[in-house]
């Protein structure tokens, strides 16, 4: 059986270097390119890569995906900063490259994806729900893509169930005191030295609370999801948003 030819973009970063090691250790994969800042994208096509694992920055991701899709290279994307406008551009590129797949995953940790699913299931059964994400102080975006996605899934579940808005009598507050509002769900971001990536979903009802928490303690926690994404994206054309779609959770 031939091995899946994988390239890593952002290979010199903390997660990227971990991804390089994970691909090299995978028996069914071959690392054909490991590109860092300043390396030319032409190496992707020259290497014969079937899949590119994109772990760069919001400033670079669109150019990288444009190149991949013009050359029929599938992509597994962990870079954040996705807006409706960017997703529309990406879908237009995919329309011009039928058969090519792109997975965008707000989080590659299997545990984090399960946390989102658990919160989505529980949300309609509680009056109140808020999300708290905690990360290292070098993280450039807030709230995290995982927290935003979690809040969106919670809001969808509550809307489908016909849940009433969460009670909140706050009349005055300092800017940001109640967090960011993501589809009606408060999301709070903490940046603290010593942390890596953590999230809590707090749910409350009369006489009880439920906390759903996940902690990533090392970048290695993201590798099983990255490898799963690389294996599945080659047979999943078009855009897939969220690793949960590759986990058969339904």
Swiss-Prot record:
User: Where, by residue number, does NAD(+) bind?
Assistant: 10-15, 78-80, 105-108
**Subcellular location(s) per record:** Cytoplasm
Which GO terms of the cellular component aspect does the record hold? cytosol
Task: Write out the residues that bind (S)-2,3,4,5-tetrahydrodipicolinate.
Answer: 136, 145-146
What is the active site of this protein? 135, 139
Q: Which InterPro entries match?
A: DapB_C, DapB_N, DapB_N_CS, DHDPR_bac, NAD(P)-bd_dom_sf
In terms of one coarse class, where is the protein primarily found?
A: cytoplasm
Q: In which pathway does it act?
A: Amino-acid biosynthesis; L-lysine biosynthesis via DAP pathway; (S)-tetrahydrodipicolinate from L-aspartate: step 4/4
- Keywords, comma-separated and alphabetical: Amino-acid biosynthesis, Cytoplasm, Diaminopimelate biosynthesis, Lysine biosynthesis, NAD, NADP, Oxidoreductase
Q: Where in this chain does the entry annotate a coiled-coil region?
A: none
Whether Cytoplasm counts among this entry's keywords is: yes
Checking PANTHER family in the record gives: 4-HYDROXY-TETRAHYDRODIPICOLINATE REDUCTASE 1, CHLOROPLASTIC-RELATED, DIHYDRODIPICOLINATE REDUCTASE
UniProt family annotation: Belongs to the DapB family.
Protein's recorded name: 4-hydroxy-tetrahydrodipicolinate reductase
